[in-house]
Swiss-Prot record:
Catalyzed reactions per annotation: Zn(2+)(in) + 2 H(+)(out) = Zn(2+)(out) + 2 H(+)(in)
GO molecular function, a single term: identical protein binding
Gene name of the record: Slc30a2
Organism annotation: Mus musculus (Mouse)
Phylogenetic lineage: Eukaryota, Metazoa, Chordata, Craniata, Vertebrata
Protein name per UniProt: Proton-coupled zinc antiporter SLC30A2
Motif stretch (Lysosomal targeting motif): 293-294
Amino acid sequence: MQTMDKQNLLESTRGARSFLGSLWKSEASRIPPVDLPAVELAVQSNHYCHAQKDSGSHPDPEKQRARRKLYVASAICLVFMIGEIIGGYLAQSLAIMTDAAHLLTDFASMLISLFALWVSSRPATKTMNFGWHRAEILGALLSVLSIWVVTGVLVYLAVQRLISGDYEIKGDTMLITSGCAVAVNLIMGLALHQSGHGHSHGNSRDDSSQQQNPSVRAAFIHVIGDLLQSVGVLVAAYIIYFKPEYKYVDPICTFLFSILVLGTTLTILRDVILVLMEGTPKGVDFTTVKNLLLSVDGVEALHSLHIWALTVAQPVLSVHIAIAQNADAQAVLKVARDRLQGKFNFHTMTIQIEKYSEDMKNCQACQGPLE
């Protein structure tokens, strides 16, 4: 067995988020033994000293604003969800109960967003060396499963009502409750509404901080969906109030709104599965990333390109870049880093520089993944 010399260049300076990796030199390697670093870069990598920005004494104002909005909206949502459950029970309306189930999806998503904002501030450990961001995904999966159970029970009760026909609905109570539901959803929408268009016209993190917080934006979209459902319940309440013989509208609305609730959770479940399966996250195109890297002067080829996400909004990248023999490794590294961060704003990037070899053309391990 041939001997291998390992030069360990790992520097774990306290608070730093940019690390030199390990350089291996082997006689059997097809890569020439040149001193080229493997560098891991995070979003803070442009600032190697963090003394100027103490996250403990100067909390992120964007996260603080998002947290306040979510606290207000979740409190309103919880109070009225309980009110809708009581109102739906008194009115004997499954449609209102289904609307309450949709409020449960809103409340769960807000709690998950609040939890994500809190847990993302926790420091990484030797065991959880990427941090605790995936806890948000597990919470989302749990909330989806619980909502499915509640919706399934309501659909079962609606089927029983249509079959038996032995039920009465108090139209006045249903009308009052559904009217309040519309008003409350409008209030929650105003509480979560953010000014600005959410577009970035620059590549700096200062520009991105002016964009809408993704957690608040997701909660706002949930509330808009629930507002539309509440309007539907209000229309059904008017029909039943003036035409009590049309009481079957209530279980029919339950079916329709259950589909809406399940449709909402399916989009969440799709995102959860994509993160857990470490698929390429939404908003990041694999081919675009590959072409962007190949367009850098001095880059001849690349391989081992992997793009995944810690959470839905935190993409991660690792790649090996093969450069020309006369190319400046540090210059290529800087350009590649800046272009990737400017376009995709990766949470963490690991870029390893190698010298290009003709053997890479026929190496199966250097080929890209299937379409």
